[in-house]
Amino acid sequence: MNSTARRTATDDVNKLIQRRYSETPRERLDYINHFSMASTDGFNPDEISWVNDRIGVTDLVGAFVAAAEGNFVINVAGETDSPCDIKEPEDPRIGPEALRETLDRIADEMHNVIETTDKKVVVHCYMGMERSVLSVVWYLHRYEGKTIDAAYQIVANVRPIAIDHRSWIAT
């Protein structure tokens, strides 16, 4: 998809999301900007932030772009509908142990896709800053041997709106 087509598709999806949720991810970002791990000046949450050559993080709008580009899309936001290959809602209210089990399933699915296909994996939640970030952090920890600190730093380097929610999985 060329940049003009991507921009048009992104604008169209933002309009649909505005109608359904009464705000776009960009508008929500303005409200919660100060929680981010790095400066978010000029950052577009609708972009896919590539953690490495096969794993990306994005918001709901970016999920539509990721699907259109043929990527394997994982939706971790129970409240959103998107063109995804799997939907595995991540809810921190279920408690740390149950959430770690959910994260294990997501990481296992990511690993399976990476090992058995040539597709890129894109994980999204509504904003692309909490649940999707934690999913990718957990994958990096579980399958690439990164510490939680190192994994969060890797993600924050490419997605400055990332919010550290390791407390959700604390024992």
How should each PLM-predicted stretch be described?
Residues 125-127:
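Short, well-ordered beta-to-alpha junction loops that form the rim of enzyme active sites
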Residues 32-123, 138-171:
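Cysteine-based protein phosphatase catalytic domain of the PTP/DSP
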Residues 129-134:
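Glycine-rich nucleophile elbow surrounding the catalytic serine of serine-hydrolase chemistry
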Residues 2-40, 64:
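A short, flexible N-terminal coil/short beta segment enriched in small residues
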